[in-house]
């Protein structure tokens, strides 16, 4: 026989569980879904069996480094062929074969975003885009910055399969004549079609956070913790959280690299260590279980 207190606790848990079920469709990434499955067995079953939750698959750090072709195929299969959006950020172990397997099983994909997936090649991307273009189906978004080896010929061929040139995030840089991503500039004086700072990241120094150009004597830049010689404009550097040791911030795209410091005082501000300072201290990165 349950006591009144036990019944109240059970009712409260049911209410919490109902709220969590409502929240599930709004979760951003696979990391968040995998975190939620640990709450309860019923929630785990709901996530595993609800096809609608898997029509958008987002895999980014810290899970990216462990993603293989087989794991990608396993998770994409949970959409039962209804996958619409595939976002893989810096998934170095994903190959052309793995991506093609997902595309063949999900012919309704409209967005492929694979920045930094260096295990892919231009030929593999083109085969996937060509496969998806059958039956008058066209990709709405194709982001492939960081996939090495694209040429003008590859770009011209891709345009024939895409709904518009704006679909793809690569173009020919007017400075170096190479196929690279050319970000827009938010600086007021550069807000024109033939702006002087129009060029790729290698030709024009830019803020890693807002992409504003950092050319001219009136601009000031600060070093970021991201590595790769990334810099930030002074405005972004001032507002971004900084490593408690070296006082360098991460840009938003690399914020997952922060190693948060547990705090016991509720009045204390959250703090973190950048990767360089964290590993210098001899600690180990945390791991996330892929199992559902």
Swiss-Prot record:
Keywords: Developmental protein, Ubl conjugation pathway. SUPFAM superfamilies: RNI-like. It comes from the Eukaryota. The keyword Hydrolase does not apply. GO terms for biological process: embryo development ending in seed dormancy; protein ubiquitination. The keyword S-adenosyl-L-methionine does not apply. InterPro entries: F-box_dom, F-box_LRR-repeat, LRR_dom_sf. Pathway: Protein modification; protein ubiquitination. Residues 21-79 form the F-box domain. Pfam families: F-box-like (PF12937). Transmembrane segments: none annotated. Disulfide bonds: none annotated. The F-box is necessary for the interaction with ASK proteins. Component of SCF(ASK-cullin-F-box) E3 ubiquitin ligase complexes, which may mediate the ubiquitination and subsequent proteasomal degradation of target proteins. Required during the endosperm development in embryos. Part of a SCF (ASK-cullin-F-box) protein ligase complex. Interacts with SKP1A/ASK1 and CUL1. This is F-box protein SKIP28. The gene is SKIP28.
